[in-house]
Amino acid sequence: MLKQVSTTLQVRAASRGLHEITDRIREWLDSERIESGLLTIFCAHTSASLVIQENAARAAREDLERLFEQVAPENPSLYTHNDEGPDDMPAHIRSALTQTQLSIPVQAGKMVLGTWQGIFLFEHRHSTPTRKIALHVIGEAQ
């Protein structure tokens, strides 16, 4: 039987950077009992994004954060848009260079992720507001 469901996660990161949300998504997906289908994850913000990234080695996430510090530095003289502080425009740049939506296949009731892959909220602001992450899955139910 075809089933389609959605929900919204509220996520508040403790700091700027990558914060794994795989388990929260997995718990919700398990509760919906979808055997095979497609999961869509959407971050409804312009200063945070979603990435699939290495989930075992913290150093990989730290290196990624350092790279983004170089690509989009907090330097007010570089930007005209700074309405919410020196991290405002760099946060928008970081978001533009990543993604706000992910599509992940579901097979045998599980997300199809590689061994070392995790789903992360990539928070680009220091103020770390609560983020809304929309989840939607469509597929064959158990």
Give the role of each language-model region.
Residues 1-142:
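Active-site histidine-anchored catalytic micro-motif
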